Design a protein with these regions (language model features):
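Short, conserved catalytic/metal-binding motifs centered on acidic residues
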Residues: 17, 113, 169-178, 216, ...
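Secondary-structure transition/capping motifs at alpha-helix termini
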Residues: 23-24, 120-124, 149, 164, ...
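Dynamic "connector" segments at or just before major functional cores
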Residues: 1-191, 210-229, 235, 243, ...
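An anionic, glycine-rich sequence signature occurring as long contiguous blocks
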Residues: 220-223, 274, 279-447, 514, ...
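Short amphipathic alpha-helical "interface-anchor" segments enriched in bulky aromatics
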Residues: 441-477
Length: 559
């Protein structure tokens, strides 16, 4: 429970708010907040013996800052104006705003939004009754958001581009998926597919995302069936993405930076038809000659600088050649750091494969001894084929010397050094290509390694409560397609604000993570202290630290 107490420091009494919890059956103070010098509160008390009816404290700093930032980009007005044409609900814009804000401030289930709202100072200042956050009203708002999502997305993207001075000439496009525990097999979105976190047994929905190449702020998104691969989706989405960019005024060409999952002559022809240039990756199976270039012939060097890790040295060679029916700039890269990581991972995989083969051979040996001529495994070629089935990719990297004499099976497994060296020679190699012949090789490399920006967006969305306390997409329990799309969009809207905060921190050279900033703002609390004989409670915000003041200035908000 919360209570007030006074404390003497250097001869001066100050007022504090304390909070106790029972620990091992003993009431122990676990939190205290400085409210100010005691003399400031003298008029509210008859004497130094405080008589208080109750104390309420509300989260204030984070919710207030988020509200101001979202107002700067006209979120609430856009929600209300786009949806209100078809509904008489005067609170619909505010309700959607709160859903987005919650994804950043304290992600919770939709039926818990009212509890979260009542714990913030929004309950005292936001012109909306808390009853509007009842679950059935929230779900109705989600349905409306889905109905008008495309119009809303266009308007919000326009506002962000203008206010943050961002260009979409260069765009990252990537895809992820989110599993769900829903069992709606009639859904058009929820399907079984290759899950990036290994939960292939669960239904999932796919999500595409685009972001600019400089700030990493996301712009366009799309939820689509969980069993679609990248090549299937790009065929459906290319024209739609072109339409979205045209609506923002990009009537010329844009450059897409894409993953190697998109490949093939028809895919890139489709991109060109829709006024897209591209930077992508070639796959070894289709273009082996570029991967076979010896490392000794990669004579150019580029140093890629990173924010949190050591710089990376990249060796490369480049050439202009015709592929996919058009001349492209092609670069073969070698990343020393990536090579070491992959060799280490291969060693672990080979060890596991060798152990699996040993176990299988032991089973062959046992059966041959027991069944003699009746055994199915009297043929060594059959045994080798079975070992190959365990892992076809790693099988050539080992030598198997297997002998069977008088129903006694013996074997020896060793490394095939020639095949091993050939296999690892491609580790750390990437082959990039681009239709932008005006770009220099080093510019292409920087743009390729800049894809970390969009990968971080997915990392933020799909993190759990241990790796990221804010902005979580899952667990997703919705089963109706319109609510799945709406939930995903509220997460993307929250991600836009998250990355805008990150962008502003970098502009002001404030060396803090967004998570740390949100934590600092969340610590700013509004106290309401009710005193007998006073109609209105005493309202007090805890004193801001210097760090909190710097954060608010960087984010361009005031409390």
């Amino acid at each position: 429970m919360a209570f007030l107490f006074k404390k003497k420091v250097r001869g001066i009494y100050s007022l504090y708010m304390g909070e106790n919890k029972k620990i091992d059956g003993v009431s122990t103070r676990v939190k205290s907040k400085y409210l100010g010098p005691l003399y400031r509160f003298k008029e509210y008390f008859a004497d130094e013996l405080f008589k208080i009816e109750h104390i309420k404290h509300y989260e204030y700093g984070l919710s207030s800052a988020l509200r101001q930032i979202m107002d700067q980009f006209l979120f609430q007005k856009i929600f209300q104006n786009k949806i209100k044409k078809q509904t008489e609900d005067n609170y619909i814009g505010k309700l959607i705003l709160l859903m987005v804000m919650n994804r950043l401030a304290d992600p919770c289930a939709k039926y818990s939004l009212q509890r979260w709202f009542n714990g913030t100072d929004l309950a005292n200042t936001f012109d909306m009754p808390a009853e509007e956050l009842e679950a059935h009203k929230v779900y109705r708002a989600m349905d409306k958001l889905d109905e008008y999502a495309e119009e809303i997305e266009t308007e919000i993207c326009k506002t962000i581009l203008i206010q943050e001075n961002i260009s979409l000439n260069m765009i990252y496009l990537d895809f992820t998926n989110q599993e769900t525990y829903s069992r709606n097999h009639d859904s058009e979105l929820l399907k079984n597919g290759h899950n990036k976190r290994g939960h292939d047994e669960l239904l999932q929905v796919n999500l595409s995302l685009t972001c600019d190449s400089n700030t990493g702020i996301p712009f366009f998104h799309k939820s689509y069936p969980g069993n679609y691969n990248d090549k299937q989706f790009i065929k459906l989405y290319t024209e739609e993405l072109r339409t979205k960019l045209d609506a923002l005024g990009y009537t010329g060409k844009n450059t897409l930076i894409i993953d190697r999952g998109i490949n093939g002559d028809k895919d890139f022809e489709l991109l060109r038809q829709n006024r897209f240039d591209y930077i992508g990756g070639l796959i070894q199976k289709e273009f082996p000659k570029y991967f076979e270039i010896p490392k000794s012939k990669l004579r150019n060097t580029h140093i890629h600088k990173r924010e949190t890790k050591e710089d990376v040295q990249i060796k490369y060679a480049s050439a202009n050649e015709k592929i996919y029916g058009k001349e492209h700039l092609i670069l073969t890269l070698y990343n020393v750091e990536s090579y070491g990581d992959k060799v280490e991972a291969l060693g672990i995989s080979l060890k596991g494969y060798k152990e699996a083969c040993e176990k299988q051979l032991q089973e062959f040996k046992k059966e041959i001894e027991e069944k003699t001529f009746q055994s199915h495994w009297n043929n060594i070629d059959k045994m080798k084929n079975k070992l190959k089935e365990i892992n076809k990719e790693l099988y050539p990297l080992l030598r198997f010397k297997i002998k069977s004499y008088r129903f006694n099976l013996t074997w020896e497994i060793s490394e095939n050094k020639k095949e091993y060296n050939k296999y690892v020679d491609n580790f750390g190699k990437y082959v990039l290509f681009t239709s932008r012949l005006d770009l220099k090789p080093k510019e292409v490399i920087e743009l390729f390694y800049g894809k970390k920006k969009i990968e971080k967006n997915f990392h933020y969305l799909k993190s759990n409560g241990y790796t990221n306390r804010y902005l979580r997409m899952g667990p997703m329990l919705h089963s109706k397609d319109e609510r799945i799309r709406s939930h995903n969009y509220t997460c993307v809207l929250a991600l836009q604000i998250y990355q805008i905060i990150n962008h502003r921190l970098k502009k002001k050279e404030l060396d803090m993570s967004v998570q740390d900033v949100l934590d600092e703002l969340k610590a700013i609390t509004y106290y309401h202290i009710k005193i007998p004989g006073q109609d209105e409670p005493i309202k007090h915000v805890n004193q801001l630290t210097q760090k909190q003041k710097e954060i608010l200035k960087a984010l361009e908000v005031e409390l």
